[in-house]
């Protein structure tokens, strides 16, 4: 009898454990994503191609993507014996590359009519120091009527890439960009700007004025601040920017035209702590401004890690109220697009 009793108790415990696991899995949230920051090509203007992107989207519940090029091309210099693998691979410079938008346009135009509504092309192939760039963007809007749904990612302050790019250092508040912001407002286009909030070593918001001035001067232009001004390179020298949270809190209150892209360098060390748990202060900020944050993968031309990048936000999303989590995961990006853009609620790619 004691043996039978022990067996019954063991079976009961095993059954209870299975029920708890099942219940936990059943209650786990499933998200449909919009990737608000995806580069179809890399820094050599090469890509794994649309079939692989479509597969990655379908397999990972990524319904919509912002799709853009890379506004610079990395040079393989005459003096370099080996082709670099990344822009930081050697000291050769990068140069502004307008054909990146042609590559994106060609890829999107080859999609089927059923696939097209899930791709949202952004223009990026222009020199942000050139006051002719606004005219170039206008020409691209006319050459591809109805195609472009935003501008960016515009590279301004961008770590070592700033030093490697030929010409002057771009600023988000220069005259050339001012013309572009006016054009964006006239055409109802959001603008994604990469503008570092500080340098690698300064522990203060050294360059904040460069992004805050356009926000103040162009209230009718919708700005997506890429990575909230942070970068992986900054974090190599400064593990965490202590001033970032209070700065964002103030700016989101002051500028209703500011939206935050949480890709690349925001998940850690900001949204999640060292144990991978959501930070309460960041949850509170997103809850206070539930329509102002969006997710992105920031992949460049290769899509094998697309799902991993997007799903890595799940611990943070799970700690938010479900309605807010779905806004951040999918809806907020769609809401910032031009009113004329088709914002399909279907999930044809994920069936």
Feature map (PLM): residue ranges:
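N-terminal secretory signal peptides that target proteins for export/translocation
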Residues: 1-10
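Bacterial N-terminal signal peptides
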Residues: 12-23
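Mid-to-C-terminal alpha-helical segments outside catalytic/metal-binding sites
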Residues: 13, 30-36, 45, 49-68, ...
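An N-terminally biased module of ancient metal coordination in phosphate/nucleic-acid-related enzymes
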Residues: 28-106
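Active-site gating/metal-coordination segments in enzymes
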Residues: 31, 81-199
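Hydrophobic faces of well-ordered beta-strands that scaffold small-molecule active sites
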Residues: 34-38, 65-67, 119-123, 150-152, ...
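Acidic-and-aromatic substrate-binding clefts and catalytic sites of carbohydrate-active enzymes
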Residues: 41-49, 72-76, 94-100, 126-134, ...
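Catalytic pocket-lining loop regions of alpha/beta-barrel enzymes
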Residues: 112, 158, 165-294
